[in-house]
């Protein structure tokens, strides 16, 4: 079901997060990700993501879109091109119309008449490269089982031991930290940015529940996943 696909927009992204991402060697991109995990489960999600500046997707800007594919034995391949704007949109629509027309022309005369009432005659003849078909349904994995890295920005009271308390909460939930950065203040509140190693989403949010109960924590204005 479409409702089972996790979707998150870019409204929470602030100038502060963009600046921290640059300092840490990342850019922020809105990605739609589908990946096979253990067994036959599929993880499908849409959300803003910190992408390493050296990654091919980091250089996709403006009206351009890209599809990045990784598999065996293919390795990594990226398809890149215009994905927005008048020209790109007109090209995509024209391609779909021409594909439909070409298939209607190639249908037997009897099927042409029936296709007016039964769209299956048209759909079954569509170019498989331009149509959307599947052989079997796939089980979507629960979001709690997703394994990824996380970026989190905390606003805390400026007092000793806050970073240590954060580390304790993360450690108790099995979350390993890759980096902890404290460089600025916002209205007398200290700003702490944390990037984790790979961790399940469930474990990460358990740690956040503990952290929210700390007296020194004012708020958690930003949470982002890291590619």
Label each PLM-derived region with a short phrase:
Residues 1-59, 64-66, 85:
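Substrate-binding/catalytic subdomain of NAD(P)-dependent oxidoreductase enzymes
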Residues 33-34, 70-72, 155:
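A generic structural motif
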Residues 86-94:
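Short, charged, low-complexity patches
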Residues 7, 79-86, 156:
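Short, surface-exposed loop/turn motifs that are enriched in glycine and acidic residues
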């Amino acid at each position: 079901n479409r409702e089972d696909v996790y979707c998150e927009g870019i409204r929470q992204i602030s100038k502060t997060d963009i600046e921290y991402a640059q300092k840490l060697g990342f850019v922020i991109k809105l990605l739609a990700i589908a990946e096979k995990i253990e067994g036959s489960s599929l993880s499908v999600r849409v959300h803003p993501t910190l992408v390493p500046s050296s990654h091919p997707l980091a250089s996709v800007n403006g009206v351009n879109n890209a599809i990045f594919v990784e598999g065996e034995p293919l390795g990594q391949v990226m398809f890149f091109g215009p994905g927005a704007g008048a020209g790109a949109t007109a090209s995509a629509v024209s391609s779909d119309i021409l594909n439909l027309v070409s298939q209607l022309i190639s249908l037997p005369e009897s099927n042409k008449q029936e296709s007016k009432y039964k769209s299956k005659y048209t759909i079954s003849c569509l170019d498989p490269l331009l149509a959307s078909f599947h052989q079997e349904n796939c089980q979507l994995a629960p979001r709690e089982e997703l394994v990824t890295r996380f970026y989190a920005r905390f606003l805390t009271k400026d007092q000793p031991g806050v970073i240590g308390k954060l580390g304790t909460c993360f450690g108790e939930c099995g979350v390993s930290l890759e980096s902890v950065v404290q460089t600025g203040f916002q209205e007398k509140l200290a700003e702490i940015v944390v990037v984790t190693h790979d961790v399940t989403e469930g474990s990460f949010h358990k740690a956040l529940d503990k952290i929210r109960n700390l007296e020194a924590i004012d708020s958690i204005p930003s949470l982002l996943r890291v590619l």
